[in-house]
């Protein structure tokens, strides 16, 4: 299915393009490739649409972090995440953005004003990019689909902690709730 966009009603949502997340060992795409592809997408979408960056952040002592019992919990650094680690990747920031959404869980929709901001801007289609493919990106894609947005995932502008995690999400989950495409195809459809 070929892509067609109404660029005035399209937003790029970049999940957690922060130094600490992009500093992790990512696969299948290294952080520099993810950041470069995000910048290409932002350059194509921003002239008529909207670019939104999300950031994961927590209050002192992680009082607002989830603490439910699980078998494999996310380990957060004792004493908090340093400010430099929370900062956005400079390649992504240089591409420009319109809004920042702070989130405290995987999905950019849950507990944030993302849906409100998208609807007030007349957004009907979202393009997703960022890290981690099978956590923040997938959770946001699921919620976007449930909120009746058309979802496009830029596969090569996403990555995860392992190729197997990324590929399962992109090949098994995302096609049921989104269109999964390469950055170049999305950029071409926006021109």
Regions found by a protein language model. Name each.
Residues 177-191:
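A charged, well-structured terminal subsegment
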Residues 162-175:
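Active-site-proximal loop->helix
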Residues 127-130, 148-163:
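A short glycine-rich beta-strand->turn/loop micro-motif centered on a GG-aromatic cluster
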Residues 47-49, 122, 148:
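Glycine-centered short loops/turns at secondary-structure junctions
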Residues 1-99, 189-191:
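Active-site acidic carboxylates
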Residues 137-147:
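Short Gly/Thr/Asp-enriched flexible loops that form oxyanion-binding sites at enzyme active sites
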Residues 82-131:
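Internal catalytic-core helix/loop-beta-alpha segment
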């Amino acid at each position: 299915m070929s892509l067609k966009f109404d660029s005035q009603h399209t937003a790029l949502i970049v999940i957690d393009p922060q130094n600490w997340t992009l500093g992790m060992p990512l696969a299948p795409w290294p952080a520099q490739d993810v950041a470069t592809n995000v910048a290409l997408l932002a350059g194509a979408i921003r002239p008529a649409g909207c670019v939104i960056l999300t950031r994961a952040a927590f209050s002192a002592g992680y009082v607002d972090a989830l603490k439910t019992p699980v078998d494999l919990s996310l380990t957060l650094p004792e004493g908090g995440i340093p400010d430099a680690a929370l900062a956005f990747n400079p390649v992504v920031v240089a591409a420009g953005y319109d809004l920042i959404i702070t989130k405290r869980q995987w999905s950019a929709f849950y507990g944030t004003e993302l849906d409100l901001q998208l609807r007030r801007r007349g957004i009907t289609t979202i393009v997703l990019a960022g890290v981690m493919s099978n956590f923040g990106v997938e959770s946001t894609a699921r919620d976007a689909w449930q909120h009746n947005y058309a979802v496009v995932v830029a596969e090569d502008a996403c990555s995860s902690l392992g190729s197997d995690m990324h590929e399962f999400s992109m090949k098994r989950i995302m096609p049921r709730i989104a269109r999964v495409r390469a950055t170049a195809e999305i950029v071409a459809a926006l021109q």
